[in-house]
């Protein structure tokens, strides 16, 4: 962020006003004062512990702020899962961060309730950053009722030496999607697995199609393993997880409990990691 020249786009589901956010906020304000375009997009429900004055302070410093689904509207939604859980940072269209980390002290292992926090977050450079930049602009335009032009936030990607680099594809999905892109890709990967399917997730609540695909894979000789945390951050969801785990064990899958603390990332692997 400190090296940003044109823009910093920040999008999180949860932002807590603690020392982690305060360090980030300081950098964002400094860059805004330097003339860098800084935008912060937050989910209303996930950031409900933040106050209006916290966002107003950023606006006074020249930072653009937008709220995804204001809470009063979100509470009226029939589907409570219509929230924006994305965690994306895009810097100058050249560097992107995406993964499981929100902003708060628990995500760096400083919360007494959870202790050590197991998560995965990626730093991406190269052409794949374009997909993150586009995703942010689309979400921003929806939440802020603006019309940012994609062309203004995309950069010509330098030609990298492909030796030693793995291909990366960013896939997004949500209520605004006409197809269930992430779900359908998971389903395809499970059906096409020949060796193993390893899943590490805090919540294992698959729908019928994913559950059946995993059972079929396990019964067909594919090594299916599922790892869940020993500590829940949502108890009701956690106990529902155990119900599905029981079905998978009965189908021959191997299931493990991560004893150190909570696993937050959802990370299935087939032959190569997918997250």
Predicted regions and their residues:
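Charged, low-complexity intrinsically disordered terminal segments
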Residues: 1-270, 275
């Amino acid at each position: 962020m400190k090296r940003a020249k044109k823009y910093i786009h920040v999008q999180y589901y949860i932002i807590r006003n603690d020392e982690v956010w305060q360090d980030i906020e300081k950098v964002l304000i400094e860059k805004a004062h330097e003339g860098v375009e800084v935008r912060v997009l937050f989910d209303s429900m996930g950031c409900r512990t933040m106050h209006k004055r916290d966002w107003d302070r950023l606006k006074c410093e020249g930072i653009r702020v937008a709220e995804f689904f204001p809470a009063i509207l979100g509470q009226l939604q029939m589907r409570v899962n219509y929230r924006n859980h994305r965690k994306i940072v895009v810097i100058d269209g050249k560097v992107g961060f995406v993964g499981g980390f929100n902003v708060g002290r628990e995500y760096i292992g400083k919360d007494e309730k959870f202790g050590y926090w197991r998560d995965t977050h990626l730093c991406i450079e190269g052409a794949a950053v374009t997909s993150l930049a586009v995703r942010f602009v689309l979400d921003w335009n929806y939440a802020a009722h603006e019309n940012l032009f994609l062309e203004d936030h995309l950069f010509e990607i330098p030609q990298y030496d492909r030796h030693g680099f793995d291909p990366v594809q960013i896939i997004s999905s949500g209520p605004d999607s006409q197809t269930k892109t992430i779900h359908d890709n998971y389903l395809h990967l499970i059906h096409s697995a020949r060796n193993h399917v390893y899943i590490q997730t805090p919540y294992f609540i698959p729908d019928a199609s994913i559950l059946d695909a995993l059972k079929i894979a396990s019964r067909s000789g594919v090594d299916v393993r599922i790892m869940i945390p020993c500590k829940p951050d949502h108890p009701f969801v956690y106990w529902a997880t155990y119900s599905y785990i029981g079905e998978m064990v009965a189908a021959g899958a191997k299931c493990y409990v991560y004893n150190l603390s909570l696993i937050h990332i959802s990370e299935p692997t087939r032959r190569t990691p997918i997250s």
